Amino acid sequence: MNKTYRVIFSAARGALMVVNELTSSVQKKGASAIVTAAALTLTSTALMAGTTLVADEGQNVDINIEVPDKNGHGVEANAGEIKTIGSEQSQITISATGKTGIAAYSEGYLTILGQNITLSSPNGKATQAAKGGQLTVGSEATEKTILSSKNEGVYASKENTSVKVNGKDIDITSSKSDGVFASSGANVTVGSENTSTLTIAGTTAICAQQTLNDKPSSVNVQADSIFLRKLFKNPRCQAGWNKNVLFGFS
C-alpha cells in the first residue's frame, strides 16, 4: 500500500507540517508509524535539524514539499546536520520558490532518495553545496532525476564540498545560468555507469573554474548517452578560467 504525504501550514504551530493525504489535519501522535518515528516538522525556510523521513519497509512514501518562503531553502542541512529525505521507493517532488531547492552547508550532509525525484526552483538554484557541505540526490536505484531551475541546476563551491546526482535518466536544466557549476576546489559528480541518458542545459552546460588563489574544481559526468545544450554565452566560463571538466562513458 502506498502512502502519500503533503505539507501544509499549521497556524496553531506556526510551521509547515507533514500530513497524510487521507487526513484533513496534522497527523496526531501515534496515528502514523512513519510520521511518529520521523518526527518531521518543516519551517518556512528548511527542515528542522536531524530530520529523517524514510519509508516503512516494503511500502512507498510519496513526499511533496512546497516551500513558499522567497528567502529560504526547500530543504537544508547546515553546521554538521545529517538529513535524509525519502527512500529508494519514494516519489519525491520538491518545489521551492526561494533561493535554493535543496542545500548543504558547513559540513552538513543532505541525501534525497526516491524512485523518481523532481526538484523545481523557478526563482533560484536547484541544488547548492558550500563550505564542506555534502549533497546527494538519488541513488543507483533511482529511475529518473529532474532538476529544473532559474539559476544553477547544480552549484558547488569551496574545498571539501561535493554534490552527487544519480539516476538512470538525469535531466538538469537552468534557464538563466549554468546547468552544472563548480568552483574553488569543489567536486561535482553527475551520473554513473548505471546512467543511460544524461541531459544538461544552461547558459553553459558545465562550468568548473579555479580562481587565482583556489584549488582546481572538477565536474565528472558519466552516462551511456550525454547531451549538453548551451542556451547562450556565459562570460563566467570563457577563456581565462582554469576549467577541469571530466567526461566518462560506461
Where are these regions (language model features)?
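Bacterial Sec-dependent N-terminal signal peptides
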Residues: M1-A37
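N-terminal Sec-pathway signal sequences of secreted and cell-surface proteins across taxa
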Residues: A38-T43
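C-terminal trimerization/auto-chaperone modules of long, extracellular attachment fibers and adhesins
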Residues: L53-A55
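Beta-strand-rich solenoid/repeat architectures in extracellular/passenger domains
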Residues: Q59-G72, I82-T100, G114-G124, G138-N151, ...
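Right-handed parallel beta-helix/beta-solenoid
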Residues: E76-I82, A103-T111, Q128-T136, Y155-V163, ...
